[in-house]
């Protein structure tokens, strides 16, 4: 490949070359547009819309539209797009990923395809990683769009539904991935179509696309309601875990991030919890509590994986070091950590709606993204999202010097060397940015610098409010900044006066991240737009990556050299070994995400069926024919179940049949049983259906057609929502237990597909039965009205219950590495009704003989 690339250029270089004729067309329009008055320039927008209405395509008007945006940007923002930014904009319009280095002006690049696609009137979503960036970009770029006659909206956490609806109705809408995803889920929980806020998903431009579509893709978005399980047992399990001794009672597998009881540990559990056999299926819930207590105490680290703030356990994002307020680990792990830390334990919640980012973003008609680092994950973008990555050349050549890694034998020696290096740079006034992988490490470096009297600012999850402010000053003379990973991403570091002469911003990485992309992001903070700069990674053999994934060969080399504590070696072999370790971890993480997607694809097909059904009901379509079709299905199912001809007395079969159907859709005394004696099953079905249809026609006369249509919609919505929520719960339990199938040499994803499909069919059958039963028994004086079947209590981007987020069957509860919570009956939130009171559904029966049978 190297030789071919040398001769023909890389794929990106060839694609960029193909854009050049269009760039020339845009540049040729420059002079003409400069002569236009502001009013004449603004008039271009309605002219473009008219041309689109007359049959021209977006591609036809692209050169002119881009040229108009460029001229307007120069007038309104004082910034004119470079040729490279025009290239980036064209790649985004084509539905691809533009890899553009830090400082190349990605925010400005997005205005080109956003304006062009905004002309269609179908909406453009620009997706950012946090509310601050969404507000900032909408405010700044909104001036440009407003000048050109397009509207801009922003979606942030605190907006109410009316404000959200208004923002989504704008031509261009900025917002975070979480907000867009949650609004989609909420729109599919509404009971009136007017409550929806989103329009159909048209075109998304995802900023920091690697962070959103890859780093965050391991964890689903979940809207939840209050569960009913007690939290007391988490405390008991925590007390038990704290008494255990490592290696004697349990073992730790750091690579898989799993903790498992030894035989001695199992014996202690049996004594403590007074059970004969800990491994028995009846103790599956006990195993679940103990597994999570072990993980909380021995795999999850405070100030690395999570923080305790104001009596609350808050997850720390492993990629950015940011606090993930409002997110919780799933599967009871969060409760186990709360027990470990002695803070208030929140109840486990019940999932009302859920989706992964992979499946949410794949629903857009066109998807594109931009980032400084995507090429290392090119395969994943192509395989999962059908997106290819095009590297856009920098406007000026990169002048940053990337030094080889320095390898130390101990962690302490490395940190001392980092502090000395910072002290040297600070003495001459060169600004330094020190990147760490955790809050813990940030504080260690900070304390070393304090001892040396070096003034510095610390940017980590604890101070994330001042993030943009701190990072924007990091390039000033004499400034030393310690940042957890990529905190502050999205804010440019501009060099202060006299810093260029000192060599620009110096980057020091204190550890290699398990993803090469994160390391490249840290490096990319220096040397923006052709500025000078340098970067060096300081590594020790005690670092997590080296300890867990590094080879013994490296340790052997370093030990032979007999290095002093603060001595380091530079070695290509070591750098290569580190890169191989990173590739290994990246490959493993890709497999995990692929497996997660395999599971969610099953749910996705089911979700589409349910949401389509809801949408049809909400749109006010006449569902009478569907109700009658459901009725016929129920009758056919009952006839084929009970009338088999196997019983000696056919009357016994008919008796069972009538008992089953009278409860659902056949009125007592309306069927003459002897008349069915000599009929085939098909004829029996037709006869019974005719009887049911007549009964329903009578019901329609009693209610009035219009009123019954609304009752049908109410009942169908309620049945769909109740059964779907219970189904989500059941599928979740299935997923947790399915990993055990790998012991039987069965692919867990295939087993999940098959069993999940059966469960879905059962749910559809249950929806039909409940809908038909309620409609055939509803009485005019207690006709039901539309109400939500469950109230949302939280919208969380749920964290996987493992820090390494393994897929089902990979050392998580339910996989070979640990027991499962097992398929327990889903928690149901039913209003408390007396068993002998009339059922609130309007059937006229006692609660215990109607809906109360399910409770």
From Swiss-Prot:
Cofactor note as given: May bind 1 zinc ion per subunit.
Comp. bias (Low complexity): 801-811
MF (Gene Ontology): ATP binding; metal ion binding; protein-exporting ATPase activity
One Gene Ontology cellular component: plasma membrane
Subcellular location(s) of the protein: Cell membrane; Cytoplasm
Principal location listed in the UniProt entry: membrane
The protein's required cofactors: Zn(2+)
Binding site for Zn(2+): 839, 841, 850-851
Alphabetical list of InterPro entries matching this protein: Helicase_ATP-bd, Helicase_C-like, P-loop_NTPase, SEC_C_motif, SecA, SecA_CS, SecA_DEAD, SecA_motor_DEAD
Amino acids binding ATP: 85, 103-107, 492
EC number: 7.4.2.8
Entry-linked PROSITE patterns: SECA, SECA_MOTOR_DEAD
Pfam families (UniProt xref): P-loop_SecA (PF21090), SEC-C (PF02810), SecA_DEAD (PF07517), SecA_PP_bind (PF01043), SecA_SW (PF07516)
Domain of life: Bacteria
Any one of the GO BP annotations: intracellular protein transmembrane transport
Topology class, membrane: Peripheral membrane protein
Cited Gene3D superfamilies: Helical scaffold and wing domains of SecA, P-loop containing nucleotide triphosphate hydrolases, SecA, preprotein cross-linking domain
Keyword Chaperone: no
Stretches the record annotates as Disordered: 794-845
Role according to the record: Part of the Sec protein translocase complex. Interacts with the SecYEG preprotein conducting channel. Has a central role in coupling the hydrolysis of ATP to the transfer of proteins into and across the cell membrane, serving as an ATP-driven molecular motor driving the stepwise translocation of polypeptide chains across the membrane.
Protein name, UniProt field: Protein translocase subunit SecA
Species assigned in the record: Clostridium beijerinckii (strain ATCC 51743 / NCIMB 8052) (Clostridium acetobutylicum)
